[in-house]
């Protein structure tokens, strides 16, 4: 094989690797619609928002969507008998283009968004749909923080720095930790659990 053909082969491979690395990633987030000024933070409306969050290779949001209408399915399955009013509020959120507020934002940007609280809307809430606005923010954060936390957990330690016995412990903590992170409902719970997992990994003895 000539040097020219080899060079072309390496170039094509490099392009494919780069293209794959830059491929957008779709994450899934969900959060209960909750909160009421008179009833308190634990009041629930009987449904959850279920959204997709598409991010680029830098973790910046390309799009937030619910193209499969999973939120509407959650509303339809409502057990407290408020499906009609909940559907109206969700429709108001969608018509207010709430998803578009997240375009080009990072995790930290989303955390800083001021959607307020039901009964006391913030500047980033969709008018008349504050509970839905808060739930979408929480769902987006759950998706982003879970993805980032799993990546941090997996890459936190280099297995080569540990003896075989400690490597087995390392793998066990990561495997079980990842499974645990995926069960958590809020981004705050995920961040707290990640910190605890890091402490466990820090306690392992290196070579």
Specify the residue positions occupied by each region the protein language model found.
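Active-site- and interface-proximal helix/loop "cap" or "latch" segments in soluble metabolic
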Residues: 26-151
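Bacterial Sec-dependent signal peptides at the C-terminal "C-region" and cleavage site
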Residues: 19-26
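Beta-rich interaction/scaffold domains
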Residues: 149-207
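Bacterial N-terminal signal peptides that target proteins for export
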Residues: 2-9
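Bacterial N-terminal signal peptides
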Residues: 10-19
């Amino acid at each position: 094989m000539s040097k020219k053909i080899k060079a072309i082969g390496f170039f094509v491979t490099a392009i494919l690797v780069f293209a794959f690395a830059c491929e957008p990633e779709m994450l899934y987030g969900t959060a209960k619609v909750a909160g009421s000024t008179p009833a308190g933070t634990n009041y629930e409306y009987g449904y959850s928002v279920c959204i997709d969050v598409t991010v680029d290779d830098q973790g910046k949001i390309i799009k937030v969507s619910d193209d499969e209408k999973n939120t509407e399915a959650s509303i339809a399955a409502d057990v407290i008998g408020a499906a009609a009013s909940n559907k109206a509020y969700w429709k108001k959120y969608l018509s207010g283009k709430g998803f578009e507020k997240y375009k080009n934002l990072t995790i930290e940007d989303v955390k800083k968004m001021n959607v307020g609280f039901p009964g006391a809307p913030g500047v980033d809430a969709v008018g008349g749909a504050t509970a839905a606005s808060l739930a979408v923010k929480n769902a987006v954060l759950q998706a982003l923080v879970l993805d980032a936390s799993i990546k941090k957990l997996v890459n936190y330690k280099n297995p080569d720095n540990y003896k075989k016995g400690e490597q087995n412990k390392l793998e066990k903590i990561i495997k079980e930790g990842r499974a645990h992170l995926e069960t958590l409902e809020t981004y705050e719970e995920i961040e707290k659990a990640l910190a605890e997992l890091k402490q466990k990994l820090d306690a392992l003895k290196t070579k």
